[in-house]
């Protein structure tokens, strides 16, 4: 169920700005209040990172990006919003005051979520007139990529609010987990705090440097945790005897001196300088923006790997990505066209994302194929071959493609694609697609493709049903009146006339 059409973000820092990106890239208009003088620049940079990451994350058609509006007051920002996300600095009095002000100005049925990392929702909602609609929605950085949100209700939060919050995070491609009882720092940050305290002791006691510690994590158990978490990882460690055997085998270790995390390290100036210097050396001159982009690329790669796991059904965050993509395809706008028009079908309008640009500074090869693939998918949806059709066991498979690259497109350039049907019969579909620069209307690439209608379960070509063929014939007959496009029928290496 989709109920968020307008969102408001109060606070636009690292977390708040990423919430803005998450909402906007889900097609939701966002109004923002942040008194920081450079809030627009900061959020703009977060948006650029998010759009770059999404271009790598999925080939599914995203909805039109939501409109961003920067406001001069909390009251202006929250007016008319369905979901309001508070992300101001982690100070109880400040957060409680901001949330109380939001509550006074917001629509009575608007949800109010707080990004707090550890404050209790009962404390945050104590001065509200409508505390039943306030809850903690604690995300993880970067919010636009990491899907988890811890949903924590306070003493006065209604059950209906948490249920609606679950629907809301699902709408924007996230995974909500409901924490049964409120506790400071919830679940994730309590685990992170335990690990963080032990890590500080290891650096303080000169056991290792920051880079060594990070290497221990990223080359070993960090990889396991990304796809199986803690308990499932240890279940496997118990072998065929399972978790009970593991607990019996390693239980005695709990009494051994293997940790100091219950002792709080003195984070004095000397330790801060030691960690700061080691971290600077580890970064090797990379800026925060560079590190963010490396992180995002790696997260995308992990999610892609998880999407293909579990026999292709997806696992963990990858299964969530697959489900989100299925919804994007189901909600994709169908190309609008008169099937009898004597002109190529205009299918796709897009822009060259920064993630599409290679080391030569222009759009890389496989992205042209992606645009042509999206174009042919648009044509298929036009004749009734959509996701439901594919789920029923039939589809069109591409069996041959010839692409010509005619221009060099830079990041940010607007493109559109057209498709002309050269011929079709009961099983075959022969198309010629062209990508144009939207500013100049010059062709920048063409693709000639042959597709076969198949029974995907039987693994063989079969005739398409009349419901599809009737639409296909109408387009084919209209396009038969067009001239054969330049480049159709060419072979690789053929000299131009």
UniProtKB/Swiss-Prot annotation:
Residues 336-497 are annotated as: Betainyl-CoA thioesterase. The keyword S-adenosyl-L-methionine does not apply. The keyword DNA-binding does not apply. Residues 1-335 are annotated as: L-carnitine dehydrogenase. It is found in: Cytoplasm. NAD(+) binds at residues 11-16. GO terms for cellular component: cytoplasm. It comes from the Bacteria. Pathway: Amine and polyamine metabolism; carnitine metabolism. Its main location: cytoplasm. Keywords: Cytoplasm, Hydrolase, Multifunctional enzyme, NAD, Oxidoreductase. Its EC number is 1.1.1.108, 3.1.2.33. GO terms for molecular function: carnitine 3-dehydrogenase activity; hydrolase activity; NAD binding; NAD+ binding. GO terms for biological process: carnitine catabolic process; fatty acid metabolic process. It catalyses: carnitine + NAD(+) = 3-dehydrocarnitine + NADH + H(+); N,N,N-trimethylglycyl-CoA + H2O = glycine betaine + CoA + H(+). Residues 330-335 are annotated as: Important for dehydrogenase activity. In the N-terminal section; belongs to the 3-hydroxyacyl-CoA dehydrogenase family. L-carnitine dehydrogenase subfamily. Homodimer. Catalyzes the NAD(+)-dependent oxidation of L-carnitine to 3-dehydrocarnitine. Probably also catalyzes the cleavage of betainyl-CoA (N,N,N-trimethylglycyl-CoA) into glycine betaine and coenzyme A. Despite a high similarity to 3-hydroxyacyl-CoA dehydrogenases, cannot dehydrogenate 3-hydroxybutylate and 3-hydroxybutyl-CoA. Is probably involved in a L-carnitine degradation pathway that allows Rhizobium sp. YS-240 to grow on L-carnitine as the sole source of carbon and nitrogen. This is L-carnitine dehydrogenase/betainyl-CoA thioesterase. It comes from Rhizobium sp.
């Amino acid at each position: 169920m989709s109920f968020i059409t307008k969102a408001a973000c109060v606070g636009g820092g690292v977390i708040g700005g990423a919430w803005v990106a998450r909402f906007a890239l889900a097609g939701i208009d966002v109004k923002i209040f942040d008194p920081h003088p450079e809030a627009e620049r900061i959020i703009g940079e977060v948006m650029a990172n998010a759009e770059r990451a999404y271009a790598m994350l999925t080939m599914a058609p995203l909805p039109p990006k939501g409109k961003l509006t920067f406001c001069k007051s909390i009251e202006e920002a929250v007016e008319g919003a369905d979901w309001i996300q508070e992300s101001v600095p982690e100070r109880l009095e400040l957060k409680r005051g901001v949330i109380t002000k939001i509550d006074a100005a917001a629509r009575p049925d608007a949800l109010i979520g707080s990004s707090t990392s550890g404050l209790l929702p009962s404390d945050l909602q104590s001065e509200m007139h409508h505390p039943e609609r306030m809850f903690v929605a604690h995300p993880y950085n970067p919010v636009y990529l990491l899907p988890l949100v811890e949903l924590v209700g306070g003493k006065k939060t209604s059950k209906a609010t948490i249920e609606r919050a679950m629907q809301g995070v699902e709408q924007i491609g996230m995974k909500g987990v409901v924490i049964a009882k409120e506790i400071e720092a919830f679940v994730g940050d309590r685990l992170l705090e335990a690990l963080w305290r032990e890590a500080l002791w290891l650096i303080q006691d000169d056991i290792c440097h920051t880079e060594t510690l990070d290497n221990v994590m990223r080359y070993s158990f960090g990889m396991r945790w990304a796809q199986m978490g803690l308990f499932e990882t240890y279940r496997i460690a118990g072998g065929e005897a399972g978790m009970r055997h593991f607990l019996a085998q390693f239980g005695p270790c709990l009494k051994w001196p293997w940790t100091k995390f219950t002792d709080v390290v003195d984070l004095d100036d000397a330790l801060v300088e030691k960690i700061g210097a080691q971290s600077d050396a580890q970064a090797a001159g990379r800026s925060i923006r560079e590190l963010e982009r490396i992180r995002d690329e790696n997260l995308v790669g992990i999610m892609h790997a998880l999407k293909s796991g579990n026999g292709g059904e997806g696992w963990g965050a990858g299964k969530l990505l697959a489900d989100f993509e299925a919804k994007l395809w189901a909600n994709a706008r169908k190309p609008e066209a008169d099937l009898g028009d004597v002109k190529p079908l205009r299918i796709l309008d897009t822009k060259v994302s920064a993630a599409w640009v290679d080391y030569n500074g222009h759009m890389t090869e496989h992205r042209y194929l992606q645009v042509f693939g999206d174009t042919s998918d648009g044509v298929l949806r036009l004749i009734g071959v959509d996701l439901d059709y594919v789920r029923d066991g039939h589809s069109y498979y591409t069996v041959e493609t010839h692409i010509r690259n005619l221009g060099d497109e830079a990041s940010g350039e607007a493109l559109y694609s057209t498709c002309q049907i050269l011929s079709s019969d009961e099983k075959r579909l022969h198309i010629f697609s062209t990508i144009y620069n939207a500013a100049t209307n010059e062709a920048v690439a063409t693709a000639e493709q042959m597709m076969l209608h198949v029974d995907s379960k039987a693994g063989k070509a079969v005739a398409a049903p009349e419901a599809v063929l009737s639409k296909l014939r109408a387009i084919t007959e209209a396009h038969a009146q067009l001239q054969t496009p330049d480049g159709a029928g060419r072979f690789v290496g053929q000299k131009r006339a």
